[in-house]
């Protein structure tokens, strides 16, 4: 988790906006963010663009039974738990810190200049 000095907490939704087993796509300071309300009450927030070709993940498939977000373009898959790449492995989504304040859902936007939209580049053999 980030310290309060390293992030700016930004409200992205309320608990009434997103029920368990649902998701939202929102824009936060010019970046697309996908907010996922897992069954059981946990909330996860990730970059909202696929790291492959920057396709909006909310346009893909969000499968709560499998716990997987699938990009609509090339079917890259990511874990809803931590944003790690499942297909292909080795890629990942930027994961925002999340906090609840009453009914509000807040995400921690890094203040240290860290890139909040990760890209995956394939390395070619020489």
What are these regions (language model features)?
Residues 1-4:
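Basic/polar N-terminal segments that are highly enriched at the extreme N-terminus
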Residues 6-9, 43:
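Tryptophan-centered short beta-strand motifs
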Residues 8-16:
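Short amphipathic
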Residues 22-125:
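Rieske [2Fe-2S] iron-sulfur-binding domain
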